């Protein structure tokens, strides 16, 4: 997506899709095993279903696999599974779903239906599986609480420094009008654990919840998140507690389920920060 469109929003045209397909073919010939997508993050979430089918079709003749962090793991969780199945079926590639979960208490009831959807697709001949981490929290950046368009064209920090844009971002967070995953809303600020600070003066917030930090600085959680990200000028590694133990146990029992850390390697002797227990 970055090769064809940079970090811009919008639909990829024919020449851009062709460039992406050429890159896929070359990568497959070089030894890649498939296509990975991260559809809640910019710029990946700017890609349409049709674009994803097209680039996966280029990997299909090489035996490529489609591995996806789906477009939703929460409010549109079931629709995201439908999209993954559609991409795999129409492109002719197997599908692997990254860290399957129903995020946010209001969505916990969807986990059983998600498993049923996957079972049904498998029974119909679709090669689809999933992986998970056996833990009730996920890890990503604090920027996952901001609408994706705020990061378009690589301008997140500029936008946070601009009063008008900051106001627009806040308005979308407070009254969501578009389909995107607000992980702070799903976890609640009381379930958002801050970990990844670079600046010495901010490390006092490491291992503390966003709600606590906001109370300490005397601002609401949105303004606190804006200030921290702008000051750090990085996404700030964050843990989001948003899954249920019952669903974790239920998913573990599925015969097509695998386990993955979804994490980077850490040297315990030299690491200075906190890490996800996965």
Show which residues each predicted segment covers:
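Divalent metal-binding pocket/active-site signature
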Residues: 17, 26, 32-83
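Active-site neighborhoods of metal-dependent hydrolases
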Residues: 1-14, 20-41, 56, 86-89, ...
């Amino acid at each position: 997506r970055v090769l064809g469109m940079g970090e811009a929003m919008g639909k990829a045209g024919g020449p851009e899709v062709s460039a992406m397909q050429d890159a896929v073919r070359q990568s497959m010939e070089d030894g890649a095993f498939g296509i990975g997508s991260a559809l809640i993050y910019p710029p990946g979430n700017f890609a349409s279903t049709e674009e994803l089918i097209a680039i996966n079709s280029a990997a299909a003749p090489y035996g490529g696999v489609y591995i996806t962090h789906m477009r939703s793991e929460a409010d549109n969780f079931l629709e995201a599974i439908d999209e993954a199945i559609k991409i795999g079926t129409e492109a002719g590639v197997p599908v692997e779903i990254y860290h399957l979960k129903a995020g946010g208490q209001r969505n916990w009831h969807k986990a059983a239906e998600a498993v049923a959807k996957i079972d049904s697709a498998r029974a119909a001949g679709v090669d689809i599986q999933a992986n998970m981490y056996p833990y009730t929290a996920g890890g990503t950046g604090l920027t996952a609480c901001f609408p994706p368009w705020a990061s378009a064209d690589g301008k997140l920090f500029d936008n946070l420094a601009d009063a008008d844009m900051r106001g627009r971002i806040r308005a979308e967070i407070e009254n969501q009008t578009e389909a995107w995953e607000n992980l702070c809303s799903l976890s609640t600020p009381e379930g958002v654990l801050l970990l990844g600070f670079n600046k010495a003066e901010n490390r006092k917030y490491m291992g503390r919840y966003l709600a606590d930090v906001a109370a300490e600085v005397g601002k609401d959680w949105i303004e606190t998140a804006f200030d921290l990200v702008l000051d750090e000028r990085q996404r700030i590694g964050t843990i989001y507690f948003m899954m249920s133990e019952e669903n974790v146990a239920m998913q573990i029992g599925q015969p097509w389920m695998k386990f993955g850390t979804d994490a980077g390697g850490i040297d315990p002797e030299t690491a200075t920060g906190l890490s996800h227990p996965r």
